[in-house]
Amino acid sequence: APPTSFTRPTPATGVLEPIRPPAAFTAAASPVPAFDVETLFKASTAPEGWLIVLGGPPKYGKTTWCLGAPSPVWILTDRGGLKSAPDSTPRMVPETWEDIARALQALLDKPHNYRAVVLDTVFKAEAMLIKYLLAKDKKDSLRKVGGGYGTGAEWVEGEINRVVDLMLKLNEKGIHTIVLSQTTLQTVKDAVLDDYEKTALAMSKKTALIWAAAADVNMYVQPEIKEPARIETGKE
């Protein structure tokens, strides 16, 4: 409550009297409604899938690794991605960005026995997305899409988030989603340390951040270096 020790003279007598606090300060506070804390937190009972982002250079075995997933199906934007896989591997080759979203929605809505969905590669899928937005807005540059001022980049992020949301819903049904990407070297400027280079997904920084933040697991493929002679002899 505000202090009541301040005084002021009354108009009639000039005698100092305490200032009364406004009624709003003396009104009783409304009681806080009671609720059960345990109803806010629930344990997961249904089996859930994982969203995995796997990055690496071409021909390093990303697609081969995904063949070990349970009952996988491919959304194949990279047409050469399954060359080393059996012809019986189920796949669909999207022609447009919308085909990718429709395929994920169908996998979400329709009955099937697939337990993993592989997007191979998101690097090519993002190129499809930009082409789709340019055609939709009848522009020749992403900078001009939506009237410019960064709107095109915002539309890209919105569409990526739409696909991520579909994948997360598939995860809730116990279906794994695996996203493959090419990689590139990226220079990181640090305010404290010297600048350094790191391996990054070959896409725009903002969309790469969306994928990395949404993923349960982020993995990068590294070459396996075998040096049996040096290990056995101790010689360089």
Regions found by a protein language model. Give the residues of each.
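Interdomain "pre-motor" coupling segment immediately N-terminal to P-loop NTPase/helicase cores
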Residues: A1-R8
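Short beta-rich binding modules
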Residues: T7, V15, T39, T45, ...
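Conserved P-loop
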Residues: A34-K131
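N-terminal pre-Walker A segment at the start of P-loop NTPase domains
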Residues: P9, G14-K42
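A solvent-exposed, charged loop/short amphipathic helix patch at secondary-structure junctions
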Residues: L129-V156
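Catalytic-core regions built around general acid/base machinery
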Residues: E159-K173
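Phosphate-binding/switch region of NTP-binding enzymes
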Residues: T177-E236
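Loop/turn-to-beta-strand initiation segments
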Residues: N113-A116, K173-V179
